[in-house]
């Protein structure tokens, strides 16, 4: 072990040792408890960012810790390699997406290895390879055969910038999740998977996920959006037509004053046939740049159709309107409007002068004032004929029962969740394995023709997908008949919905999964990724697992037992305003900063002399130019320092503020530890520790050591509080550096302490600990060393620190033997000068003793 800590001299050598010895390669072993730790796989964008580093460091620390507990630990990594950014990069760099992607994978793989992550690289999965997506295509055809896949023309969210469809989950505040372009609605043929068939199970099984964050489960519950209500059929006046609406508030049914239908509803189409004004409004609705999320805030618009519906209970006519806030793909494409008790309906009725009727009382049971808005509380019914006076639930049931008895109502459970549209009009994705025969019938591609391979040697024009532009690619033969392949590709969330299962058998070629391997490793024990995936990836991930279960591929109900959503990594952000008024963001590395005595930034400039505005800490991003390159930090400080900072700076679920001064602090601690181990080992081997002859000071130090082992074990193993675990080790280190090293017992105790410290830190700083463990005489690599176990006897205090109070005020502290009786403690307290002076010339009225903690002497 060299005297100075120089990561550049050790890290690469140790990484090569791990690779050569297959240190982290695992196979199924029924004699060992398995542990599957997984971080969400990265998109190969070209370079790792600090968010990746944090995610993967957390996963690696958990994995290494579990290995030290003797478990058979699987920690794989792979590449979510399809996706739109590759197409943009290919056009920009005049290449094809495939070589750009593979080049990025190669570079990022090197970055991961330099960070010392203990992956089983033999299980690496790349989702853009035919070996991977072949089984995704096969599974899709099986879902089609089971009736879980269908194609229909539907209104979709269309991104005019990326020229592709977006799932509802991919529309954020009316804009594309990827490029922030306002989303349009467009009707095109799409392939769907029936996630709605699993809505109830997806909802109910959230209750079994005890170790998932409540926030994620709440977001999924809200997205699934289960509601109980009644589907009601209205006759249309003067015709044989009917219309159906769904309501969760049948208690307000007597307050319906109009109904509204979507632009695509058959009644809207009928009304538009001879009315250009209605047709114009329908066209306007269809071209809206609108997603469901914006419906609540947009201006409500509508047009009367001239048609009327007959209220089933009152037989009154209510006007039918076409409205821009009703979507054909939600529910029945029609809603009943109760403007007295729904804010949106009130807003619309007020705008167009439609009747507003009160059928729910105010809190006092009186007629409510509806002049300024709707009353939305669920109070008792009024103005509702035979139902007046009933409370909300009784009114719900009575009206639902009456409508059902009349044959015009049916109780139903509805879901906000829509079926998963998996078609994308892009090139760089897995081809959808369906084809159209000459007679127009659509069939799945047979198993023996899978995979449908995506050609990789293509030219990108940035406008049309190469497989759509090449008519020859689509031509094929199925069962002897000419056919045309589907030219849409899968939503890339398909690949990331089952990769975790393929890691269990990446080379298996007899099927999608090897049941033996999959059922040994699954479910995942710890899954780590960002909260931003709560209602996209994590919903599809759960859904796909249930699909695979029902296909007999896995035998568990959920894909992951525990989920950790790590916080974002923040960094300082600076900008100056240019002559054009635009903000020009300057990298923190280029900012020259002045700070006050509290370390707050008071002034910043860049090398060109621009005075910079400090925009505070914000998420590292390209847009704010405040990303810190992990590669630079590894080259400057070493991988272990970066890893140590990541684990120490904040609890894993909270945001982490990148401060280079704190990185330097982590590096200083590492050097101190290295120096202490070096100084100790330079003095030669130590004798065995003789517990029977320890001095009081040595017992105290050993007690601190084993209490630290107990705390760190709990912090790392149960609480995932890595920052407090490291803080406890740092506190112990301070005591070790002050501990005398004059006797063989002193040195033997130091040996025990350093062996424990190095093992506790090895999941976090594995390279340095590898070397220090060897220097301390470890007979095998630290990678197979067990986690230290706290000695319960060593943690027992021989003495207790007692707080002494006089009349409830702290007057002193004394140390007494652990089993001391009250009289002895009182006697010792009265001999303590700081206490005795308050006992002069007074009478002791009472003495209260809390054993081992506190003595309160009450005087008068």
From Swiss-Prot:
Signal peptide range: none
GO terms for biological process, alphabetical: leucyl-tRNA aminoacylation
Motif 'HIGH' region: chain residues: 42-52
Catalyzed reaction equations: tRNA(Leu) + L-leucine + ATP = L-leucyl-tRNA(Leu) + AMP + diphosphate
Gene name of the encoded protein: leuS
Motif 'KMSKS' region: positions: 619-623
Domain of life: Bacteria
Transmembrane intervals: none
Chief location category: cytoplasm
GO cellular component, one term: cytosol
Protein name per Swiss-Prot or TrEMBL: Leucine--tRNA ligase
InterPro entries: aa-tRNA-synth_I_CS (IPR001412), aa-tRNA-synth_Ia (IPR002300), Leu-tRNA-ligase (IPR002302), Leu_tRNA-synth_edit (IPR025709), M/V/L/I-tRNA-synth_anticd-bd (IPR013155), Methionyl/Leucyl_tRNA_Synth (IPR015413), Rossmann-like_a/b/a_fold (IPR014729), tRNAsynth_Ia_anticodon-bd (IPR009080)
Residues binding ATP: 622
Gene3D superfamilies cross-referenced by the UniProt entry: 2.20.28.290, 3.10.20.590, HUPs (3.40.50.620), Isoleucyl-tRNA Synthetase, Domain 1 (1.10.730.10), Valyl/Leucyl/Isoleucyl-tRNA synthetase, editing domain (3.90.740.10)
Family: Belongs to the class-I aminoacyl-tRNA synthetase family.
């Amino acid at each position: 072990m060299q005297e100075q800590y120089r990561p550049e001299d050790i890290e690469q050598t140790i990484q090569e040792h791990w690779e050569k010895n297959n240190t982290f390669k695992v196979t199924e072993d029924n004699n060992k408890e398995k542990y599957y730790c997984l971080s969400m796989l990265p998109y190969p964008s070209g370079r790792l960012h600090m968010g990746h580093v944090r995610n993967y460091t957390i996963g690696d620390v958990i994995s290494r810790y579990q290995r030290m507990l003797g478990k058979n630990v699987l920690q794989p990594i792979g590449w979510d390699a399809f996706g739109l950014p590759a197409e943009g990069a290919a056009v920009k760099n005049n290449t094809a997406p495939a070589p750009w992607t593979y080049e990025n994978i190669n570079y990022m793989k090197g970055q991961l290895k330099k960070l010392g992550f203990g992956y089983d690289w033999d299980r690496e999965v790349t989702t853009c390879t035919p070996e991977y997506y072949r089984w995704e295509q096969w599974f899709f055809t099986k879902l089609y055969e089971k009736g879980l896949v269908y194609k229909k023309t539907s209104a979709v969210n269309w991104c005019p910038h990326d020229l592709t469809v977006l799932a509802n989950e991919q529309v954020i505040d009316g804009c594309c999740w990827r490029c922030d372009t306002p989303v349009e609605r467009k009707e095109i043929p799409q392939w769907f998977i029936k996630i709605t068939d699993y809505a109830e199970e997806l909802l109910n099984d959230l209750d079994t996920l005890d170790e998932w964050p409540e926030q994620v489960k709440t977001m999924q519950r809200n997205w699934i959006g289960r509601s109980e209500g009644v589907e009601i059929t209205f006759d249309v006046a003067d015709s044989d037509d009917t219309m159906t609406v769904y309501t969760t508030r049948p208690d307000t049914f007597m307050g319906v004053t109009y109904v509204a239908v979507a632009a695509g509803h058959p009644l809207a189409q009928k009304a538009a046939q001879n009315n250009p004004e209605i047709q114009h409004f329908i066209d306007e609705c269809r071209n809206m740049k609108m997603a469901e999320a914006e419906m609540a805030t947009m201006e409500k618009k509508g047009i009367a159709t001239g048609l009327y519906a007959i209220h089933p209970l009152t037989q009154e006519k209510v006007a039918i309107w076409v409205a821009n806030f009703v979507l054909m793909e939600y529910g029945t494409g029609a809603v009943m409007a109760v403007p007295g008790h729904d804010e949106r309906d009130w807003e619309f009725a007020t705008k167009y002068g439609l009747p507003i009727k009160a059928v729910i009382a105010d809190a006092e049971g009186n007629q409510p004032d509806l002049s300024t808005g709707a009353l939305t509380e669920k109070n008792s019914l009024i103005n509702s004929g035979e139902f007046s006076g009933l409370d909300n639930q009784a009114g719900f049931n009575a009206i639902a029962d009456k409508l059902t008895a009349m044959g015009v109502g049916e109780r139903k459970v509805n879901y906000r969740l829509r079926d998963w549209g998996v078609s994308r009009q892009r090139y760089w994705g897995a081809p959808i394995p369906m084809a159209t025969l000459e007679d127009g019938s659509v069939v799945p591609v047979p198993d023996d023709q899978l995979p449908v391979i995506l050609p990789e040697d293509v030219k990108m024009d940035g406008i049309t997908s190469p497989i759509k532009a090449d008519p020859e690619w689509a031509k094929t033969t199925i069962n002897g008949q000419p056919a045309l392949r589907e030219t849409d590709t899968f939503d890339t969330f398909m690949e990331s919905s089952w990769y975790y299962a393929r890691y269990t058998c990446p080379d298996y070629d007899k099927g999608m999964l090897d049941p033996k391997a999959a059922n040994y490793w699954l479910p995942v024990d710890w899954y780590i990724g960002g909260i931003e995936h709560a209602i996209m990836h994590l919903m599809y991930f759960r859904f796909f697992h249930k699909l695979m279960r029902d296909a007999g591929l896995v035998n568990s109900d959920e894909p992951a037992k525990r989920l950790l959503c790590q916080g974002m990594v923040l960094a300082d952000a600076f900008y100056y305003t240019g002559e054009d008024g635009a903000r020009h963001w300057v990298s923190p590395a280029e900012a020259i900063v002045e700070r006050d005595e509290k370390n707050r930034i008071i002034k910043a400039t860049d090398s060109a002399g621009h005075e910079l505005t400090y925009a505070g800490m914000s998420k590292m991003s390209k847009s704010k130019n405040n990303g810190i390159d992990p590669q630079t930090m590894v080259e400057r400080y070493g991988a272990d320092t970066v890893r140590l900072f990541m684990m120490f700076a904040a609890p894993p679920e909270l945001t982490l503020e990148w401060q280079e001064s704190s990185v330097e602090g982590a590096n200083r601690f590492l050097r101190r530890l290295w120096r202490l181990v070096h100084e100790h080992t330079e003095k030669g081997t130590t004798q065995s520790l003789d517990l029977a002859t320890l001095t009081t000071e040595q017992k105290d130090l050993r007690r601190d050591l084993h209490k630290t082992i107990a705390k760190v074990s709990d912090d790392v193993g149960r609480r995932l509080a890595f920052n407090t675990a490291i803080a406890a080790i740092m506190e112990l280190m301070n005591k070790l550096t002050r501990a005398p090293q004059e006797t063989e017992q002193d040195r033997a105790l130091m040996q025990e302490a350093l062996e424990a410290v190095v093992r506790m830190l090895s999941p976090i700083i594995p390279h340095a600990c590898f070397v220090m463990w060897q220097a301390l005489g470890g007979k095998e690599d630290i990678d197979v060393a067990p986690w230290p176990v706290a000695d319960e006897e060593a943690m027992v205090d021989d003495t207790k620190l007692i707080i002494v109070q006089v009349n409830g005020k702290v007057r002193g502290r004394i140390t007494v033997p652990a089993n001391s009786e009250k009289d002895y403690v009182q006697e010792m307290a009265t001999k303590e000068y700081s206490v005795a002076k308050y006992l002069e010339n007074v009478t002791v009225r009472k003495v209260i003793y809390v054993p081992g903690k506190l003595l309160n002497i009450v005087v008068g």
